[in-house]
Amino acid sequence: MKGSAVTGPFGLSAALSEREQAGLLRSRIATDGASGGRLRVAGRDYLNFSANDYLGLAGHSAIKTAFQGGIDRYGAGAGASPLVTGYSRAHQQLEETLADWLGVEAVLLFNCGFSANQAVLKALLGKDHLLWQDKLNHASLQEMGSQLPCKMKRFGHNDMTALERQLEPNRGLIVSEGVFSMDGDQGSWRELAALAAQSGNWLMIDDAHGLGVLGSEGRGTLAAQGVAPASVHIQMGTFGKALGVAGAFVGGSRELVDYLVNFARHYVYSTHMPAAQACAVSQSIELVRAADEARAHLGQLITRFRQGAQALGWQLGASDTPIQPLLVGESGAALQLAERLRECGVWAGAIRPPTVPVGTARLRITLSAAHREQDVDRLLEALGPRPSTDERGGAHGA
Protein backbone atom coordinates (compact mmCIF):
# COMPACT_ATOMS: atom_id res chain seq x y z
CA MET A 1 0.00 0.00 0.00
CA LYS A 2 1.32 3.42 -0.95
CA GLY A 3 1.57 5.80 2.00
CA SER A 4 0.65 4.99 5.57
CA ALA A 5 -0.99 6.46 8.63
CA VAL A 6 2.48 7.52 9.80
CA THR A 7 4.13 8.91 6.69
CA GLY A 8 1.10 9.74 4.55
CA PRO A 9 1.07 9.93 0.74
CA PHE A 10 3.20 13.08 0.35
CA GLY A 11 6.69 12.12 1.52
CA LEU A 12 6.96 15.01 3.97
CA SER A 13 9.68 13.46 6.13
CA ALA A 14 11.83 12.55 3.15
CA ALA A 15 11.52 16.02 1.64
CA LEU A 16 12.43 17.71 4.92
CA SER A 17 15.33 15.32 5.50
CA GLU A 18 16.68 15.99 2.02
CA ARG A 19 16.54 19.75 2.63
CA GLU A 20 18.28 19.37 5.99
CA GLN A 21 21.08 17.20 4.60
CA ALA A 22 21.69 19.78 1.87
CA GLY A 23 21.93 22.57 4.44
CA LEU A 24 18.81 24.18 2.99
CA LEU A 25 16.23 23.54 5.71
CA ARG A 26 14.33 26.69 6.60
CA SER A 27 12.90 27.60 9.98
CA ARG A 28 11.44 30.66 11.67
CA ILE A 29 12.72 32.81 14.51
CA ALA A 30 10.17 34.74 16.56
CA THR A 31 11.21 38.34 17.15
CA ASP A 32 10.13 40.56 20.00
CA GLY A 33 9.97 43.63 17.79
CA ALA A 34 11.85 45.27 14.94
CA SER A 35 11.97 48.95 14.02
CA GLY A 36 14.44 51.76 13.56
CA GLY A 37 17.15 49.47 12.24
CA ARG A 38 17.04 47.39 15.42
CA LEU A 39 15.80 43.89 16.22
CA ARG A 40 15.13 42.05 19.49
CA VAL A 41 15.30 38.26 19.59
CA ALA A 42 15.19 36.16 22.77
CA GLY A 43 15.88 39.19 24.91
CA ARG A 44 18.93 40.35 22.96
CA ASP A 45 19.16 43.46 20.78
CA TYR A 46 20.72 43.36 17.32
CA LEU A 47 21.45 45.78 14.53
CA ASN A 48 18.99 44.69 11.85
CA PHE A 49 20.40 44.50 8.33
CA SER A 50 17.82 42.04 7.03
CA ALA A 51 14.54 44.00 6.85
CA ASN A 52 12.98 45.77 3.87
CA ASP A 53 12.01 48.82 5.95
CA TYR A 54 14.18 50.99 3.71
CA LEU A 55 13.06 54.38 5.03
CA GLY A 56 12.60 53.30 8.64
CA LEU A 57 8.87 54.07 8.58
CA ALA A 58 7.48 50.86 10.08
CA GLY A 59 7.59 52.35 13.56
CA HIS A 60 6.75 55.96 12.63
CA SER A 61 4.39 57.55 15.13
CA ALA A 62 2.24 59.25 12.47
CA ILE A 63 1.61 55.94 10.69
CA LYS A 64 0.72 54.21 13.96
CA THR A 65 -1.65 57.06 14.82
CA ALA A 66 -3.31 56.81 11.39
CA PHE A 67 -3.67 53.05 11.81
CA GLN A 68 -5.30 53.47 15.21
CA GLY A 69 -7.58 56.19 13.89
CA GLY A 70 -8.65 53.87 11.09
CA ILE A 71 -9.46 51.13 13.59
CA ASP A 72 -11.53 53.55 15.64
CA ARG A 73 -13.53 54.54 12.55
CA TYR A 74 -13.72 51.33 10.51
CA GLY A 75 -12.91 48.52 12.93
CA ALA A 76 -10.09 45.99 12.83
CA GLY A 77 -11.08 44.12 9.64
CA ALA A 78 -12.83 44.71 6.33
CA GLY A 79 -15.24 41.85 7.01
CA ALA A 80 -15.92 41.02 3.37
CA SER A 81 -14.66 40.89 -0.19
CA PRO A 82 -14.26 44.29 -1.87
CA LEU A 83 -17.14 43.40 -4.18
CA VAL A 84 -19.48 42.83 -1.24
CA THR A 85 -19.01 45.37 1.58
CA GLY A 86 -15.25 45.28 2.11
CA TYR A 87 -14.47 48.36 -0.01
CA SER A 88 -14.48 51.56 2.06
CA ARG A 89 -13.94 55.23 1.46
CA ALA A 90 -10.46 54.76 2.98
CA HIS A 91 -9.61 52.23 0.25
CA GLN A 92 -10.96 54.55 -2.42
CA GLN A 93 -8.95 57.50 -1.12
CA LEU A 94 -5.77 55.41 -1.07
CA GLU A 95 -6.34 54.31 -4.67
CA GLU A 96 -6.81 57.93 -5.73
CA THR A 97 -3.68 59.01 -3.85
CA LEU A 98 -1.61 56.28 -5.49
CA ALA A 99 -2.91 57.10 -8.97
CA ASP A 100 -2.00 60.77 -8.53
CA TRP A 101 1.43 59.96 -7.08
CA LEU A 102 2.43 57.45 -9.76
CA GLY A 103 0.81 59.05 -12.79
CA VAL A 104 -1.65 56.29 -13.67
CA GLU A 105 -5.38 56.47 -14.37
CA ALA A 106 -6.50 54.02 -11.72
CA VAL A 107 -5.29 51.65 -8.99
CA LEU A 108 -6.56 48.43 -7.40
CA LEU A 109 -5.51 47.29 -3.91
CA PHE A 110 -4.43 43.76 -3.00
CA ASN A 111 -3.55 42.00 0.24
CA CYS A 112 0.05 41.29 -0.81
CA GLY A 113 2.40 41.53 -3.77
CA PHE A 114 2.41 37.77 -4.35
CA SER A 115 -1.34 37.71 -4.95
CA ALA A 116 -1.27 40.95 -6.97
CA ASN A 117 1.31 39.55 -9.40
CA GLN A 118 -0.46 36.24 -9.76
CA ALA A 119 -3.88 37.86 -10.13
CA VAL A 120 -2.72 39.98 -13.06
CA LEU A 121 -1.08 37.14 -14.97
CA LYS A 122 -3.96 34.74 -14.42
CA ALA A 123 -6.58 37.31 -15.43
CA LEU A 124 -4.84 38.41 -18.63
CA LEU A 125 -3.03 35.47 -20.19
CA GLY A 126 -4.75 32.68 -22.13
CA LYS A 127 -3.57 29.85 -24.34
CA ASP A 128 -3.03 32.09 -27.37
CA HIS A 129 -0.76 34.55 -25.54
CA LEU A 130 2.96 34.68 -24.83
CA LEU A 131 4.61 35.71 -21.56
CA TRP A 132 8.21 36.95 -21.46
CA GLN A 133 9.97 37.07 -18.09
CA ASP A 134 13.40 37.99 -16.79
CA LYS A 135 14.97 34.84 -15.35
CA LEU A 136 15.41 36.56 -11.98
CA ASN A 137 11.80 37.68 -11.59
CA HIS A 138 10.10 37.02 -8.27
CA ALA A 139 8.80 33.54 -7.45
CA SER A 140 5.19 34.77 -7.63
CA LEU A 141 5.65 35.65 -11.29
CA GLN A 142 7.67 32.59 -12.25
CA GLU A 143 5.29 30.21 -10.51
CA MET A 144 2.12 31.60 -12.05
CA GLY A 145 3.75 31.83 -15.47
CA SER A 146 4.59 28.12 -15.36
CA GLN A 147 0.98 27.22 -14.48
CA LEU A 148 -0.80 29.23 -17.17
CA PRO A 149 -1.98 27.85 -20.52
CA CYS A 150 0.10 30.44 -22.37
CA LYS A 151 3.69 29.81 -23.43
CA MET A 152 6.26 31.42 -21.13
CA LYS A 153 9.67 32.42 -22.43
CA ARG A 154 12.41 33.49 -20.02
CA PHE A 155 15.27 35.72 -21.09
CA GLY A 156 18.67 36.09 -19.43
CA HIS A 157 18.85 38.62 -16.64
CA ASN A 158 18.54 42.12 -18.13
CA ASP A 159 19.54 40.71 -21.54
CA MET A 160 17.63 42.97 -23.90
CA THR A 161 19.20 41.40 -26.99
CA ALA A 162 17.87 37.99 -25.97
CA LEU A 163 14.43 39.44 -25.27
CA GLU A 164 14.32 41.18 -28.63
CA ARG A 165 15.06 37.88 -30.38
CA GLN A 166 12.21 36.18 -28.51
CA LEU A 167 9.54 38.82 -29.06
CA GLU A 168 6.64 38.31 -31.42
CA PRO A 169 4.35 41.20 -32.37
CA ASN A 170 1.17 41.81 -30.39
CA ARG A 171 1.21 38.46 -28.60
CA GLY A 172 1.26 39.14 -24.88
CA LEU A 173 3.06 40.53 -21.84
CA ILE A 174 6.66 41.38 -20.91
CA VAL A 175 7.36 41.35 -17.16
CA SER A 176 10.42 42.47 -15.25
CA GLU A 177 11.29 44.02 -11.91
CA GLY A 178 12.22 47.55 -10.97
CA VAL A 179 14.75 46.46 -8.36
CA PHE A 180 15.54 42.75 -8.20
CA SER A 181 14.91 41.47 -4.71
CA MET A 182 17.97 39.23 -4.29
CA ASP A 183 20.53 41.13 -6.38
CA GLY A 184 19.52 44.74 -5.81
CA ASP A 185 20.19 45.81 -9.40
CA GLN A 186 17.61 47.55 -11.56
CA GLY A 187 15.76 46.45 -14.67
CA SER A 188 16.57 48.18 -17.97
CA TRP A 189 13.33 50.08 -18.24
CA ARG A 190 14.07 52.45 -21.11
CA GLU A 191 15.01 49.49 -23.29
CA LEU A 192 12.07 47.44 -22.05
CA ALA A 193 9.64 50.25 -22.83
CA ALA A 194 11.11 50.69 -26.30
CA LEU A 195 10.89 46.96 -27.08
CA ALA A 196 7.31 46.77 -25.84
CA ALA A 197 6.29 49.73 -27.98
CA GLN A 198 8.05 48.40 -31.07
CA SER A 199 6.53 44.93 -30.75
CA GLY A 200 3.02 45.97 -29.70
CA ASN A 201 3.18 43.94 -26.49
CA TRP A 202 2.16 45.02 -23.00
CA LEU A 203 4.74 45.72 -20.30
CA MET A 204 4.50 45.15 -16.53
CA ILE A 205 6.82 46.30 -13.74
CA ASP A 206 7.07 44.73 -10.30
CA ASP A 207 8.46 47.70 -8.35
CA ALA A 208 8.10 46.29 -4.85
CA HIS A 209 11.66 47.26 -3.92
CA GLY A 210 11.97 50.50 -5.90
CA LEU A 211 8.84 52.28 -4.70
CA GLY A 212 9.58 54.86 -2.04
CA VAL A 213 13.35 54.57 -2.44
CA LEU A 214 14.05 55.67 -6.01
CA GLY A 215 12.98 58.64 -8.10
CA SER A 216 11.47 62.04 -7.41
CA GLU A 217 9.22 61.89 -4.33
CA GLY A 218 9.99 58.16 -4.12
CA ARG A 219 7.92 57.37 -7.21
CA GLY A 220 10.11 54.39 -7.97
CA THR A 221 12.27 52.90 -10.67
CA LEU A 222 10.43 54.36 -13.66
CA ALA A 223 10.81 57.89 -12.30
CA ALA A 224 14.46 57.27 -11.47
CA GLN A 225 15.16 56.10 -15.03
CA GLY A 226 13.09 58.81 -16.72
CA VAL A 227 10.48 56.41 -18.12
CA ALA A 228 6.97 57.81 -18.60
CA PRO A 229 4.33 55.89 -16.63
CA ALA A 230 2.17 55.69 -19.75
CA SER A 231 4.80 53.55 -21.50
CA VAL A 232 4.40 50.77 -18.90
CA HIS A 233 0.92 49.26 -19.04
CA ILE A 234 0.91 47.70 -15.56
CA GLN A 235 2.62 48.85 -12.37
CA MET A 236 2.70 46.63 -9.29
CA GLY A 237 4.05 47.88 -5.99
CA THR A 238 3.88 46.96 -2.34
CA PHE A 239 3.35 48.77 0.95
CA GLY A 240 5.43 46.44 3.13
CA LYS A 241 8.90 47.61 2.13
CA ALA A 242 9.80 51.31 2.02
CA LEU A 243 6.27 52.34 3.02
CA GLY A 244 6.52 50.38 6.24
CA VAL A 245 2.99 48.91 6.36
CA ALA A 246 1.60 45.95 4.34
CA GLY A 247 -0.41 45.23 1.19
CA ALA A 248 0.03 45.90 -2.50
CA PHE A 249 -1.52 47.51 -5.56
CA VAL A 250 -1.79 47.29 -9.32
CA GLY A 251 -1.96 50.49 -11.34
CA GLY A 252 -2.67 51.25 -14.98
CA SER A 253 -5.51 52.36 -17.20
CA ARG A 254 -9.07 52.66 -15.92
CA GLU A 255 -10.04 49.88 -18.33
CA LEU A 256 -7.37 47.57 -16.88
CA VAL A 257 -8.57 48.16 -13.32
CA ASP A 258 -12.21 47.63 -14.33
CA TYR A 259 -11.18 44.38 -16.01
CA LEU A 260 -9.32 43.17 -12.92
CA VAL A 261 -12.28 44.01 -10.68
CA ASN A 262 -14.26 41.55 -12.79
CA PHE A 263 -11.69 38.88 -13.66
CA ALA A 264 -8.90 38.90 -11.03
CA ARG A 265 -9.90 35.98 -8.82
CA HIS A 266 -7.37 36.83 -6.09
CA TYR A 267 -9.20 40.16 -5.72
CA VAL A 268 -12.78 39.01 -6.14
CA TYR A 269 -12.62 36.06 -3.74
CA SER A 270 -10.49 37.48 -0.91
CA THR A 271 -11.52 39.47 2.15
CA HIS A 272 -10.19 42.97 1.51
CA MET A 273 -7.31 44.52 3.44
CA PRO A 274 -8.54 46.35 6.56
CA ALA A 275 -9.63 49.94 5.97
CA ALA A 276 -7.39 50.94 8.89
CA GLN A 277 -4.44 49.57 6.94
CA ALA A 278 -5.40 51.77 3.99
CA CYS A 279 -5.44 54.77 6.35
CA ALA A 280 -1.93 53.90 7.51
CA VAL A 281 -0.64 53.53 3.93
CA SER A 282 -2.13 56.90 2.93
CA GLN A 283 -0.24 58.52 5.81
CA SER A 284 2.92 56.67 4.81
CA ILE A 285 2.73 57.97 1.24
CA GLU A 286 2.58 61.52 2.56
CA LEU A 287 5.76 60.88 4.54
CA VAL A 288 7.50 59.11 1.65
CA ARG A 289 6.86 61.94 -0.79
CA ALA A 290 8.58 64.36 1.60
CA ALA A 291 11.46 62.03 2.51
CA ASP A 292 14.17 63.41 0.22
CA GLU A 293 16.54 63.89 3.17
CA ALA A 294 16.04 60.28 4.29
CA ARG A 295 16.66 59.01 0.75
CA ALA A 296 19.86 61.07 0.53
CA HIS A 297 21.04 59.69 3.88
CA LEU A 298 20.26 56.16 2.69
CA GLY A 299 22.32 56.74 -0.44
CA GLN A 300 25.28 57.83 1.68
CA LEU A 301 25.00 54.70 3.82
CA ILE A 302 24.93 52.50 0.71
CA THR A 303 28.13 54.12 -0.56
CA ARG A 304 29.79 53.82 2.86
CA PHE A 305 28.96 50.13 3.09
CA ARG A 306 30.05 49.28 -0.45
CA GLN A 307 33.38 51.06 -0.13
CA GLY A 308 34.06 49.47 3.24
CA ALA A 309 33.08 45.93 2.25
CA GLN A 310 35.10 46.04 -0.95
CA ALA A 311 38.11 47.36 0.97
CA LEU A 312 37.80 44.28 3.19
CA GLY A 313 37.90 42.03 0.11
CA TRP A 314 34.23 41.00 0.02
CA GLN A 315 32.48 40.45 -3.29
CA LEU A 316 29.29 42.47 -3.73
CA GLY A 317 26.63 42.41 -6.42
CA ALA A 318 26.33 45.36 -8.80
CA SER A 319 23.74 47.25 -6.75
CA ASP A 320 23.28 50.91 -5.88
CA THR A 321 20.06 50.25 -3.94
CA PRO A 322 19.49 49.32 -0.28
CA ILE A 323 19.71 45.62 -1.21
CA GLN A 324 23.39 44.70 -1.03
CA PRO A 325 24.17 41.04 -1.82
CA LEU A 326 27.41 39.93 -0.21
CA LEU A 327 28.29 36.88 -2.27
CA VAL A 328 29.68 33.88 -0.40
CA GLY A 329 29.12 30.88 -2.67
CA GLU A 330 28.26 27.78 -0.66
CA SER A 331 25.22 27.56 1.59
CA GLY A 332 27.18 26.34 4.61
CA ALA A 333 29.60 29.24 4.40
CA ALA A 334 26.72 31.73 4.20
CA LEU A 335 25.09 30.23 7.30
CA GLN A 336 28.37 30.32 9.21
CA LEU A 337 28.95 33.95 8.31
CA ALA A 338 25.43 34.93 9.35
CA GLU A 339 25.93 33.15 12.69
CA ARG A 340 29.25 34.91 13.25
CA LEU A 341 27.58 38.28 12.69
CA ARG A 342 24.82 37.40 15.16
CA GLU A 343 27.46 36.66 17.78
CA CYS A 344 28.61 40.25 17.21
CA GLY A 345 25.08 41.62 17.60
CA VAL A 346 24.42 42.07 13.88
CA TRP A 347 21.52 40.36 12.08
CA ALA A 348 21.82 39.67 8.34
CA GLY A 349 19.97 36.89 6.55
CA ALA A 350 21.70 34.06 4.69
CA ILE A 351 19.99 33.45 1.34
CA ARG A 352 20.42 29.98 -0.14
CA PRO A 353 19.06 27.87 -2.99
CA PRO A 354 16.39 27.50 -4.23
CA THR A 355 15.84 31.23 -3.61
CA VAL A 356 19.11 31.93 -5.47
CA PRO A 357 21.01 29.71 -7.93
CA VAL A 358 23.27 26.97 -6.59
CA GLY A 359 26.75 28.32 -5.85
CA THR A 360 25.54 31.89 -5.26
CA ALA A 361 24.51 31.75 -1.58
CA ARG A 362 24.86 35.15 0.01
CA LEU A 363 24.12 37.47 2.83
CA ARG A 364 21.31 39.73 1.70
CA ILE A 365 22.29 42.89 3.53
CA THR A 366 19.65 45.60 3.49
CA LEU A 367 20.28 49.17 4.57
CA SER A 368 17.73 51.57 5.99
CA ALA A 369 17.54 55.31 6.47
CA ALA A 370 17.03 54.43 10.15
CA HIS A 371 20.64 53.22 10.30
CA ARG A 372 23.45 55.55 11.34
CA GLU A 373 26.97 55.71 9.96
CA GLN A 374 28.26 54.02 13.12
CA ASP A 375 25.80 51.16 12.53
CA VAL A 376 27.33 50.52 9.11
CA ASP A 377 30.81 50.73 10.60
CA ARG A 378 29.81 48.14 13.20
CA LEU A 379 28.55 45.84 10.45
CA LEU A 380 31.85 46.20 8.60
CA GLU A 381 33.79 45.53 11.80
CA ALA A 382 31.75 42.37 12.38
CA LEU A 383 32.40 41.20 8.82
CA GLY A 384 36.12 41.80 9.05
CA PRO A 385 38.49 40.95 6.19
CA ARG A 386 37.28 38.25 3.85
CA PRO A 387 38.94 34.94 4.74
CA SER A 388 41.12 33.16 2.23
CA THR A 389 39.78 30.06 0.47
CA ASP A 390 41.61 27.74 2.87
CA GLU A 391 40.30 29.59 5.91
CA ARG A 392 36.76 29.29 4.54
CA GLY A 393 37.10 25.53 4.31
CA GLY A 394 36.93 25.49 0.53
CA ALA A 395 34.03 27.90 0.17
CA HIS A 396 34.23 30.10 -2.88
CA GLY A 397 32.72 33.33 -4.10
CA ALA A 398 29.95 33.32 -6.67
Curated annotation (Swiss-Prot):
UniProt superkingdom: Bacteria
Pfam families tied to this protein: Aminotran_1_2 (PF00155)
N6-(pyridoxal phosphate)lysine: residues bearing it: 241
PROSITE patterns, per the entry: AA_TRANSFER_CLASS_2
Protein name: 8-amino-7-oxononanoate synthase
Known cofactor(s): pyridoxal 5'-phosphate
Pathway(s) of this molecule: Cofactor biosynthesis; biotin biosynthesis
Lineage, highest ranks first: Bacteria, Pseudomonadati, Pseudomonadota, Gammaproteobacteria, Aeromonadales
Positions with a binding annotation for substrate: 26, 138, 355
Annotated organism of origin: Aeromonas hydrophila subsp. hydrophila (strain ATCC 7966 / DSM 30187 / BCRC 13018 / CCUG 14551 / JCM 1027 / KCTC 2358 / NCIMB 9240 / NCTC 8049)
